[in-house]
Amino acid sequence: MKTALFTLLSVLLSGSALATPYKVDMGHSAVLFKVKHFNVGYTFGSFKSFKGSFEEGASVELTVDASSVDSNVEKRDSHLKGPDFFNVKQFPEITFKGSKWEGDTVTGALSFHGVTKEVSLKVEKVGAGADPWGNQRVGYYGELTIKRSDFGVSYGVKEGSASDELTLIISLEGVQKKG
């Protein structure tokens, strides 16, 4: 299946001259989602393949391969990749291009399923420090709830099989290689 890219964050701020670039450590990061199922429980999923980088307090770029979606049910994963949900053949990329990171809020344009909307992501700095190899690391966590129907994805909403609200859960650990 054609690779679909999910660029979740690309944030530019003033004062970035002192920003330090970090590469997202995929082995210690996660991009997850949850959606209510029949309004009685949640269905969770994740994306197994992504890459990115960020300059703390300045910019972030995250690209997620949407075809790597994994909900622990192969048949459902095939449906998620199809036209009712991600439609990876027609809309190969989902992007977020931020324009502002103030305090604990990152704001920018989320483009998904051919629609672009401004959204705000509340982030928490989890921690920062050196690893045993002398590299600097920093971690951020955030959740963003969107309405799927705002992006033209409304399969199951009317019937109640899948809620309109979808929450993205993003946990990124960045590493700055020494030297």
Task: Describe the residue ranges of each PLM region.
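Positively charged n-region of N-terminal signal peptides that target proteins for export
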Residues: 1-4
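N-terminal signal peptide c-region/cleavage motif recognized by signal peptidases
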Residues: 14-16
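Low-complexity, acidic/polar, glycine-enriched regions of mature
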Residues: 18-179
